[in-house]
Amino acid sequence: GSTGLIPFGRT
């Protein structure tokens, strides 16, 4: 659920 460098499903 993060949209930093890599959109992972974690914070």
UniProtKB/Swiss-Prot annotation:
Transmembrane segments: none annotated. The keyword Secreted applies. It comes from the Eukaryota. One of its GO terms (cellular component) is extracellular region. It is found in: Secreted. Expressed in abdominal perisympathetic organs and abdominal ganglia. Keywords: Amidation, Neuropeptide, Secreted. Pfam families: Periviscerokin (PF08259). The keyword NADP does not apply. Belongs to the periviscerokinin family. This is Periviscerokinin-1. It comes from Cyrtotria poduriformis.
